[in-house]
């Protein structure tokens, strides 16, 4: 677990302000757009999870809405719990194949039987 510096609030406000100037106000995962009135719901995520790694070009930052940010961090919690690995920005669900069951496959035939 990373040690949180005493001046964390000041550091956070500094990189947040920079990130909001560098990037469009859009969640990097769900593409939700933000305006000034709901900007508090847009967070800065550190891609490498090191809150002290704040390069001026923003290469370690990603703007995420509250929900996507929570989801991103929950993946790491689950990985710790179950001993799996996580690749930043990727979901395990992407590896799952397409669904093969089609509930409407014979719908026309079923409807014709009732007539």
UniProtKB/Swiss-Prot annotation:
Q: Which Pfam families match?
A: HNH
UniProt keywords, alphabetically: Hydrolase, Nuclease
Tell me where in this chain the HNH domain is found: 27-75
Q: Which InterPro entries match?
A: HNH, HNH_nuc
Alphabetized GO MF terms: endonuclease activity; nucleic acid binding; zinc ion binding
Q: Which Gene3D superfamilies match?
A: 1.10.30.50
**A GO-annotated cellular component:** cytosol
Question: CDD domains in the record, alphabetically?
Answer: HNHc
Q: What class of enzyme is it?
A: hydrolase
What are the annotated disulfide bridges? Answer: none
Stated EC number for the protein is: 3.1.-.-
The record's family statement is: Belongs to the HNH nuclease family.
User: In its UniProt entry, what is this protein called?
Assistant: Putative HNH nuclease YajD
Organism encoding this protein: Salmonella typhimurium (strain LT2 / SGSC1412 / ATCC 700720)
């Amino acid at each position: 677990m990373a040690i949180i510096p005493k001046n964390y609030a000041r550091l956070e406000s500094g990189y947040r302000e920079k990130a909001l100037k560098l990037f469009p106000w859009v969640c990097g995962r769900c593409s939700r757009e933000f305006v000034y009135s709901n900007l508090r719901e847009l967070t800065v995520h550190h891609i490498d999870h090191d809150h002290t790694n704040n390069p001026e070009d923003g290469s370690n930052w990603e703007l995420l809405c509250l929900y996507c940010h929570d989801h991103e961090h929950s993946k790491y919690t689950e990985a710790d719990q179950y001993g799996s690995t996580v690749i930043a920005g990727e979901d395990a669900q992407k590896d799952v194949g397409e669904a093969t069951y089609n509930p409407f496959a014979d719908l026309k035939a079923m409807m014709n039987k009732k007539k």
